[in-house]
Structure formats: C-alpha cells, structure tokens
Amino acid sequence: MSRSIKKGPFVDAHLIKKVDTAVAGKDKKPIKTWSRRSTILPEFIGLTIAVHNGRQHVPVYINENMVGHKLGEFALTRTFKGHAADKKAKR
C-alpha cells in the first residue's frame, strides 16, 4: 500500500537541512546520507547524494526522472556474481 496523499512525501529532517544548505551555497560536494527511506523531491534535482548501501556510500546524481522514488532504490545492497556454470552443459 502506498503512502496517503494527504500526508505528503517522507524525507528525513536532517537530509532536508543538508540539501537546503547545499542549494543556498551552490555546493557541488556529494551529500552523505544513511536515509535510504527518504523520497526524492524536486529540490534535489542536480545534486549528488551519497546513499549508504550497508558497506559504502554510493554517489547518486539526481535528475527529474527520479522524483517521487526513494533514495534506496538507486543504491543496490546486493551484488549478483552470477550462477556457477553447469559442468554437464560444457561437455
């Protein structure tokens, strides 16, 4: 079930504060955050946000197609190495 429209999108308060200071200061440094649950707002467009994936911070450049999605969708937490090749199929 999606979030109620009357509540509005959820964004952590500390992330909004960091974005506001970056926009006001024209700062191009990535904003480091652990808040994967925050929704991307139109104010974030053009910023680079380093989202934590459990091991490191993955830089995510925000564009207009990402608005409305969560930050965690763009920082993958699992790495797929591929399945082992079948020995019978090789012969």
Swiss-Prot record:
One Pfam family, please name it: Ribosomal_S19
Q: Which domain of life is it from?
A: Bacteria
Q: Name one GO cellular component term.
A: cytoplasm
> Could you mention a single GO BP entry for this protein?
ribosomal small subunit assembly
Q: Which GO terms describe its molecular function?
A: rRNA binding; structural constituent of ribosome
Which InterPro entries does the record associate with it?
Answer: Ribosomal_uS19, Ribosomal_uS19_bac-type, Ribosomal_uS19_CS, Ribosomal_uS19_SF
Which keywords describe this protein according to UniProt?
Ribonucleoprotein, Ribosomal protein, RNA-binding, rRNA-binding
What HAMAP family does the record point to?
Ribosomal_uS19
The family assignment reads: Belongs to the universal ribosomal protein uS19 family.
State what this protein does. Protein S19 forms a complex with S13 that binds strongly to the 16S ribosomal RNA.
This protein is called Small ribosomal subunit protein uS19
Which gene codes for it?
rpsS
